[in-house]
From Swiss-Prot:
Classification lineage: Eukaryota, Viridiplantae, Streptophyta, Embryophyta, Tracheophyta
Biased composition, class Low complexity, residue ranges: 174-185
Any one GO CC term of the record: ribosome
Region (Disordered): 157-214
SMART domains the UniProt entry points to: Ribosomal_L2_C
Organelle targeting peptide span: 1-30
Keywords of the record: Mitochondrion, Ribonucleoprotein, Ribosomal protein, Transit peptide
Protein's name in the database: Large ribosomal subunit protein uL2my, C-terminal part
Length: 214
């Protein structure tokens, strides 16, 4: 009986020593590796959260121009504070902030390439308007434009003089004379930009000031 008890004790001690020498170190290595990966993923997650916490660089954020950084791409820009977005709203367009606010105004580069001073309290949205390929869409038949609600447009040169200023004459002439006539609406208003109402002197002065500050 005593011999059987001694044999059981020897087997138990051998199994415990085997566990301590082989299985426990492997389990310890596995647990430490898992903890390291957890710590690494936690650090990476914290860095990512810190980057995304910066509201000034988040696409879609709307805020006053004075709170944005230089070089920020923006759209949906107000002309006057609280008026609502008036500029840079077409598909795929964007503007850029060129300078820090000076005297309560920010210098903005518009999609046309022109620069404009806008009140720093005016709000804008960070990012570019979606659907940049809107202008490249091709209509394969006239019916597609009708699906979009666009009705046919008759050219002015194809009308009679009583219906349009471009009408009448021989061939496709818009009017008589050596130089012809600029394109106008059916009511005689220039249709390519309308009448220029801005003062030429003020426009030249504004462009000179913008060039001097660049």
């Amino acid at each position: 009986m005593s011999g059987l008890v001694a044999l059981c004790r020897a087997r138990a001690s051998a199994s415990s020593s085997l566990f301590n020498s082989v299985i426990r170190p492997a389990f310890r290595n596995f647990s430490t590796g898992f903890a390291d990966t957890q710590n690494k993923s936690l650090v990476a997650q914290m860095k990512e959260e810190m980057l995304h916490m910066d509201i000034n660089s988040m696409i879609g954020s709307s805020m006053p121009l004075g709170m944005m950084r230089i070089g920020t791409i923006i759209h949906n820009i107000e002309m006057n504070p609280g008026q609502g977005a008036k500029m840079v709203r077409a598909a795929g367009t964007n503007a850029k902030i060129l300078k820090e606010p000076a005297k309560g105004k920010c210098l903005i580069k518009l999609p046309s390439g022109d620069t404009k001073w806008i009140n720093a309290k005016c709000r804008a949205t960070i990012g570019t308007v979606s659907n940049p390929s809107h202008g490249t869409k091709k209509l394969y038949k006239a019916g597609q434009s009708r699906w979009l609600g666009i009705r046919p447009k008759v050219r002015g040169v194809a009308m009679n003089p009583c219906d349009h200023p471009h009408g009448g004459g021989e061939g496709k002439s818009k009017s008589s004379g050596s130089r012809g006539r600029t394109s106008v609406s059916p009511w005689g208003k220039p249709c390519k930009g309308g009448y220029k109402s801005a003062s030429v002197k003020k426009k030249k002065k504004r462009l000179a000031e913008a060039a001097a500050k660049m």
